[in-house]
Amino acid sequence: MKYVIMLAIVVGLAIADFVTGIIKAAINRDISSQKMRIGGLHKIMELLVMTTACGLEIGIRELGKYYQAPQLAEIAGAFAAGAVFAYILSMEIISILENYVEANPEAKWAAGIVKKLRVFQQQKEKEEHNDSADQQSGEG
């Protein structure tokens, strides 16, 4: 049952993100069928990734029973599905907030949240880029 709930939440947030994106585009007079098609395909991929993570959790749990390590397998599987779920959940909520801010620039509370999240994201990307550059320079 928890998988159905997780998938329902992901589907609900994906639909909300898609709809807020359409509303934002309509308000900004920037409706594009290509963007809608690509956005819809991204949402389908998110659902497939979440479904795969749920299947992975089930598979790892069953494999743990076979190898006499059910608790360890259950923790590993739950972590995998939970991590994917948390990532998709946060990504969708951030996207919905971004759509809201772009459609309604007067929403200062949401704009502040989005601004902080963008700074955090840029710092993380910069750190990842630096780590990648360090690894490449160490290999040469």
Go through each PLM region and give its residues.
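Membrane-proximal cytosolic segments adjacent to transmembrane helices
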Residues: S90-G140
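N-terminal signal-anchor/start-transfer transmembrane helix
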Residues: A8-A26
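Mid-chain, well-packed structural core segment of small domains
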Residues: G55-M91
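Alpha-helical transmembrane segments and their lipid-water interface positions
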Residues: T20-K24, M50, E98-E102
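Transmembrane helix-loop junctions in multipass membrane proteins, especially transporters and channels
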Residues: A25-S33, I58, E62, Y66, ...
